[in-house]
Amino acid sequence: MRWIVASAWPYINAVPHLGTLVQVLSSDVFARFLRKMGEEVVFVSGSDEHGTPIEIEAIRKGIAPRDLTDKMHAYITWLFESFGISYDNYTRTESDVHKEFVRDFYLKVYNEGHIFERETEQLYCPKDEMFLPDRFVTGTCPYCGYERAHGDQCDRCGRLLNPTDLIDPKCSICGSVPEMRRTKHWFFDLPKFSERLRKYIEENENLPENAKTLSLSMIEEGLRPRSLTRDNKWGIPAPFPGSEGKTIYVWMEAVLGYVSAVKEYFLKRGEAERFEEFWKSGDTRSVYFIGKDNIPFHTIIFPALLMASGEGYALPFSVASTEFLLYEGEKFSKSERRGIWMDEALQLLPADYWRFYMIYMRPELKDASFSWEDFESKVNDELNDTIGNLVHRILSFIASRYSGQIPSVELDEEASGFLMRVREIGREIEENLMKIKLRDALRSLIEMARLGNKFFNNREPWKDFESNRGRADSTILASYILLKILAFYMHIFMPSSAEKLWKMLGLEGEPEDRVAFSYHDNGKVSSLEPLFRKIKKEELINRLNQIRERGEVLSARES
């Protein structure tokens, strides 16, 4: 089976926080799992860099938008690499492949008769001599009264807005009052695909219920044509006849990045023909890891665009959406510096600590909240005391009593039964991962470690070592095999720690099933060191405040 795994493209006007990291980590865990199972996977994402927020920021800084996004793209690429995200292609919307693909794609949709032209009234700034789309306008939200709402969305109540909805609108650049002027734009005829979308959603058993319910509700209410163009300068030029000076709306071009990123991946490999093999084959499944606020773009707009192209692109197999991640019970806020940003997290602890906790508390069915108290508890109790302690006890015993050598012995009945149960837990991990129940899969991994601790305690090899060596040898061999299997599954969630454990087991390369599940392919235990350490929340909070006061990372200097 071929798989396309994708995470939502982060908008790179700022460093992502832990809420964004949840989706990225989730997609990475799933991609790593599929590779472990021998599936053919292309894992993609990229930097979303067009649109008004970046254009406005560049104007304020007196630099070109591309100069700003070059810097941010490089920084965010480094952050994802530092977190162990195993993208096959992390690209950007400024890539030549993406820009060419988007223009060609929309020209095909236009020629198929699914895009039309309409004259509309838009806000215009006479002083700056420009139309004011999206965030080029600020004003009072008509729903909640927030006085600094943007022309595309209110940051307080979350309602999506049009610039003309705002009360007392003002130009974001110069602060002057805009006027209404007529301008021409192009629209995607989304309502035309209502029935095809309804059928696709109703018949897709792999879409989560919350995504199905929301999407079908929107279809029932009646879909509206979607604006395709903007009067921005910073974006992909619209390809339609008479559309000179217009760009493709950032949301409507970035969503096509899932397709263009796969095309770019195979072009880089010199295998251009494989792009269609992946995207236009009935044997390919595509899965998208997103937040619940992005559901409509992935269950309605993106599938409708793929249908409209007439090119036979595979529709989304599943949309793995999550609820919101909060910080100590409240929404993340850059302006109020509430939350933890990715570069700050890396300054506090190694990436695997965050990978572990973000998946452990992944908001799969309801909103979840990061709390320092729970973070401390789960890292210390589950990661350090359960997994780390198991590894230390077994390997220390092998190093001291067996000089690092793994005994070659026939396993007794109890030890064989123990490993059978370990394999059963392994299958539970795999089943949960395939169902994208990542929290349950990680909890099963912890249960495997608990079972190992119980087995080692009950067997007491330190007593048998002198009096019943055969039983002690059987205990140690079974425990060593457990650690190999544990490392194999850990590599999906915490790759750096798993590779560290694999090396301590005296094994080469990275954890693989052929060696992990073998009773004979064993190494020599050496170079022991703690796999994890305990943390103290007070120390981490103090260190975080220090990072911000000193401006040690980019996100701290942005605020």
From Swiss-Prot:
Residues that hold ATP according to the record: 334
The keyword Metal-binding belongs to this UniProt entry's keyword annotation: yes
Coiled-coil intervals, chain numbering: none
Residue span of motif 'KMSKS' region: 331-335
A family per Pfam: tRNA-synt_1g
SUPFAM superfamilies xref list: Anticodon-binding domain of a subclass of class I aminoacyl-tRNA synthetases, Methionyl-tRNA synthetase (MetRS), Zn-domain, Nucleotidylyl transferase
Subcellular location: Cytoplasm
EC class: ligase
GO molecular function: ATP binding; metal ion binding; methionine-tRNA ligase activity
Alphabetical UniProt keywords: Aminoacyl-tRNA synthetase, ATP-binding, Cytoplasm, Ligase, Metal-binding, Nucleotide-binding, Protein biosynthesis, Zinc
Gene Ontology cellular component terms for the protein in this record: aminoacyl-tRNA synthetase multienzyme complex; cytosol
Catalytic activity: tRNA(Met) + L-methionine + ATP = L-methionyl-tRNA(Met) + AMP + diphosphate
UniProt motif 'HIGH' region: location: 10-20
Binding site for Zn(2+): 141, 144, 154, 157
Family annotation (Gene3D superfamilies): HUPs (3.40.50.620), Isoleucyl-tRNA Synthetase, Domain 1 (1.10.730.10), Methionyl-tRNA synthetase, Zn-domain (2.20.28.20)
EC numbers for this chain: 6.1.1.10
Cofactor binding remark: Binds 1 zinc ion per subunit.
GO biological process: one example: methionyl-tRNA aminoacylation
Family: Belongs to the class-I aminoacyl-tRNA synthetase family. MetG type 1 subfamily.
Function: Is required not only for elongation of protein synthesis but also for the initiation of all mRNA translation through initiator tRNA(fMet) aminoacylation.
Protein name according to UniProt: Methionine--tRNA ligase
Lineage: Archaea, Thermoproteota, Candidatus Korarchaeia, Candidatus Korarchaeales, Candidatus Korarchaeaceae
